[in-house]
């Protein structure tokens, strides 16, 4: 059974209306836009009364030969409870992204720039620059390297970006503060039955001397993750 889309993860305590447009501008350009209004008659998480939200999105894409150029902008306005839990305040977030991608026979490159601005009782800004390269020059062997620099005022202006993962998996981690993130992805298909995937990612923060808190606290400004996956087809 299909499931309707919603402002949250599922349709609950919500009604609304959405208008969307997809437009082909000639042979190479496409334009996508939507506007979504949602109303919540009852209280929900961090909102102590009935509320509403607006979500606007605009994206244009240019695709020709081996090149893809994408520009997108999203404006979202929501209501949330204030510190006294007695009233509601408006929270507005703006996100923009510009992506240039090239795909060739053996190499693929992707350059991405993100900017974000969140405004409520305070204003928070941030940006992120990401570069990735993928090589598939040998049969059954593929390698991807990705590096990012991020700088945001705080968690309110965090930036999400796609990162390749193991087979049937991917992630959209959030980055805030200031630092560098880099990752190396390797995949080897050995014959018809064996496949090995390895992923190493490292994040170095410039604005803190520890990461996380409680039992998950890391007492340094850098963290590394290593993932391995081995598959055998019987």
Regions found by a protein language model. Give the residues of each.
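Exposed, low-structure sequence patches enriched in small/polar residues
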Residues: 1-234
